[in-house]
């Protein structure tokens, strides 16, 4: 039987683009681990993706995961859009390159053999874990230590 893990994620950006951060909480039974990091220049969507990626990459074995995010971009991207993006060689229906393709590919790889249920939670609505992730993300964004290598400013 697969381990049942809960993951909660959030991303934050002080300006968009601007300094950003992500926060994630992973829970297995009574054990909890938090993740966060801040980047000097990035976007909110990239930080939302990073939160999910980092938490999923931390799983050491195949798990059954409920991943809660307040990002419709992440949830819809992974449940509705990614299949066609991959079929089209990471292009949108308009034949344009998928934005944040580096992170979508990394998230796709991080899914591995996990059984994942993607849940959307309303942000800033009192959901305790989402509020904690938001605090982690905002604190990390306030003290960025890393460069977001894949960030490409819009031209």
From Swiss-Prot:
Coiled coil: none annotated. PROSITE patterns: RNASE_H_1. Mg(2+) 1 binds at residues 10, 48, 70. It comes from the Bacteria. GO terms for cellular component: cytoplasm. The keyword Magnesium applies. InterPro entries: RNase_H, RNaseH-like_sf, RNaseH_domain, RNaseH_sf, RNaseHI. One of its GO terms (molecular function) is magnesium ion binding. Binds 1 Mg(2+) ion per subunit. May bind a second metal ion at a regulatory site, or after substrate binding. It is found in: Cytoplasm. Mg(2+) 2 binds at residues 10, 134. It catalyses: Endonucleolytic cleavage to 5'-phosphomonoester. Residues 1-142 form the RNase H type-1 domain. SUPFAM superfamilies: Ribonuclease H-like. The keyword NAD does not apply. One of its GO terms (biological process) is DNA replication, removal of RNA primer. Keywords: Cytoplasm, Endonuclease, Hydrolase, Magnesium, Metal-binding, Nuclease. Its EC number is 3.1.26.4. Its cofactor is Mg(2+). Endonuclease that specifically degrades the RNA of RNA-DNA hybrids. Belongs to the RNase H family. Monomer. This is Ribonuclease H. It comes from Klebsiella pneumoniae (strain 342). The gene is rnhA.
